[in-house]
């Protein structure tokens, strides 16, 4: 149920990128650096 905490949006852990709750859903984070200074 808590896919947001473990998988984020496309299956990557939040810890790996820092935060996929925002840019993770919109674009591949593996190609984009973490632009979010938090997680919102």
Curated annotation (Swiss-Prot):
Residues 36-40 form a propeptide. The keyword RNA-binding does not apply. One of its GO terms (biological process) is regulation of blood pressure. GO terms for molecular function: hormone activity; toxin activity. GO terms for cellular component: extracellular region. Belongs to the natriuretic peptide family. This is Natriuretic peptide PaNP-b. It comes from Pseudechis australis (Mulga snake).
């Amino acid at each position: 149920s808590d896919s947001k905490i473990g998988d984020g949006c496309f299956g990557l852990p939040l810890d790996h990128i820092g935060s996929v709750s925002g840019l993770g859903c919109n674009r591949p984070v593996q190609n984009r650096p973490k632009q979010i200074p938090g997680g919102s």
